[in-house]
């Protein structure tokens, strides 16, 4: 599965210039970088929420799942929200148990806390199998316990489906825990890409080294 080269320009200024890459099935790709580096713009373009300057981004797949930073909840029960993305009730029950929301399955989803809404949105996405999945800061509203629980479920979903998963994260520790490959964005450009051991511990670009030193990896 390939991502074709693309760029994004706002008011005459290029905010993202991506050279393209090949995604391997069954791998987790963590996107790291400072605020404003282009991480979320990258995810939104791949998800089709934003348009790139060029036509088309993904090659060889139209099966893409996306969880944005801001999650939506319809005015119905938590379980009913989850079943909007698939009617397999046994799977919904298993996911509710796995993410710790079973006791809230009948609560109106628009009354959940931020962390609960994020967990609901994550398992709602997991009701379907996709070739590629984009998660934009999926655990930002969660505490450490539910973050680790969600990371375990994400890794399990990738193993189960064989999808390629792109994870935008502000947490270098999260990238270290569950990523296979890491992409470092700097001022709208992909500055470093490779196995997490190389990017996080033996980076080549001085900007990457400075970023990692600042955030304590």
PLM feature spans:
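Conserved ABC ATPase signature
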Residues: 108-112, 116
């Amino acid at each position: 599965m390939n991502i074709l080269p693309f760029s994004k320009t706002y008011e005459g200024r290029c905010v993202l210039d991506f050279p393209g890459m090949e995604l391997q099935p069954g791998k987790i790709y963590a996107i790291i970088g400072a605020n404003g580096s282009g991480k979320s713009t990258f995810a939104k373009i791949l998800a089709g929420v934003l348009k790139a300057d060029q036509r088309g981004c993904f090659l060889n797949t139209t099966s893409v799942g996306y969880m944005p930073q801001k999650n939506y909840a319809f005015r119905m029960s938590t379980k009913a929200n989850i079943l909007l993305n698939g009617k397999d009730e046994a799977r919904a029950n298993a996911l509710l148990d796995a993410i710790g929301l079973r006791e809230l399955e009948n609560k109106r989803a628009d009354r959940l806390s931020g962390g609960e809404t994020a967990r609901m949105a994550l398992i709602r996405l997991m009701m379907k199998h996709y070739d590629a999945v984009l998660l934009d800061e999926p655990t930002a509203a969660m505490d450490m316990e539910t973050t680790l629980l969600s990371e375990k479920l994400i890794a399990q979903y990738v193993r189960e489906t064989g999808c390629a998963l792109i994870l935008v994260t502000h947490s270098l520790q999260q990238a270290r825990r569950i990523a296979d490959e890491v992409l470092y964005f700097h001022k709208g450009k992909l500055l470093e890409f490779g196995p997490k051991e190389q990017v996080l511990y033996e980076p080549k670009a001085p900007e990457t080294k400075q970023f990692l030193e600042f955030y304590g990896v």
